[in-house]
Each structure stands twice: as structure tokens, then as C-alpha cells.
């Protein structure tokens, strides 16, 4: 009984982590900002969003800087000091790979408070 409860809790956590979040357009503070700054506010936010996220293979410091749900900032060894890059790992067995990618997405979600 305890194992089935644990499996249900894990599957619910994975489902919640992968569920797309909704963004409510036009909140009060965003509307005030747009009125004060005019067209520059939206352009600045769009440019900032493009520049902040990194692609695979680019150097990083935190998980939340990398683009993609299961792309994490991993240490790459080969020099004297480790270099951190945005990386994704794949497993050869598809069922295990799906579980591993969900685990990485949860890990990224848990560490996202550092970038805010």
C-alpha cells in the first residue's frame, strides 16, 4: 500500500511539473508599467527574454539560465577546473529516458529560485 501511494505521489509531481503554466496578460502592475514607459517597455522585455536563456553547449552558472525543461547546467571536466555548460543527457532505454528527463525538469524547477 505504501509503495502504490509513493508511485501516485511521484506521478502527480511529474504531471504538475510538466503542466504548462498560464500567464495572465494585462495585470495591474504590468499595465501601469506599459502606460509609464510606452512602447519601450514591451520591446525591452522581449529583448531581455531572448538574451537571458542559453542554448545547449553555452557556458552557464545556474540551471535556470539554460533553455529547455530538462537542460541543466552541468560540470564538464577535461581541464584543471570544471567548466559549466548547458547540457542534456539521454538514456538508451526510452522509458528510463522519459523518467530521467522528468527528474531533471523537477530538479530545474526546484533550483529556479536562484535566478529570480
From Swiss-Prot:
It comes from the Eukaryota. Transmembrane segments: none annotated. Residues 1-17 form the signal peptide. GO terms for cellular component: extracellular region. Keywords: Disulfide bond, Secreted, Signal, Toxin. Expressed by the venom gland. GO terms for molecular function: toxin activity. Contains 3 disulfide bonds. Its main location: secreted. It is found in: Secreted. Residues 18-50 form a propeptide. Belongs to the neurotoxin 25 family. F7 subfamily. This is U3-theraphotoxin-Lsp1a. It comes from Lasiodora sp. (strain IBSP 8539) (Brazilian salmon pink birdeater). The lineage of its organism: Eukaryota, Metazoa, Ecdysozoa, Arthropoda, Chelicerata.
Amino acid at each position: 500500500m505504501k509503495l502504490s501511494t509513493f508511485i501516485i505521489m511521484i506521478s502527480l509531481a511529474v504531471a504538475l511539473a510538466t503542466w504548462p503554466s498560464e500567464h495572465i496578460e494585462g495585470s495591474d502592475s504590468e499595465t501601469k508599467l506599459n502606460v509609464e514607459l510606452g512602447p519601450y517597455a514591451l520591446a525591452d522585455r522581449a529583448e531581455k527574454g531572448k538574451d537571458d536563456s542559453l542554448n545547449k553547449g553555452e557556458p552557464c552558472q545556474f540551471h535556470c539560465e539554460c533553455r529547455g525543461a530538462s537542460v541543466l547546467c552541468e560540470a564538464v571536466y577535461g581541464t584543471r577546473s570544471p567548466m559549466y555548460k548547458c547540457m542534456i543527457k539521454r538514456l538508451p532505454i526510452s522509458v528510463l529516458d522519459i523518467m530521467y528527463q522528468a527528474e531533471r525538469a523537477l530538479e530545474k524547477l526546484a533550483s529556479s529560485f536562484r535566478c529570480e
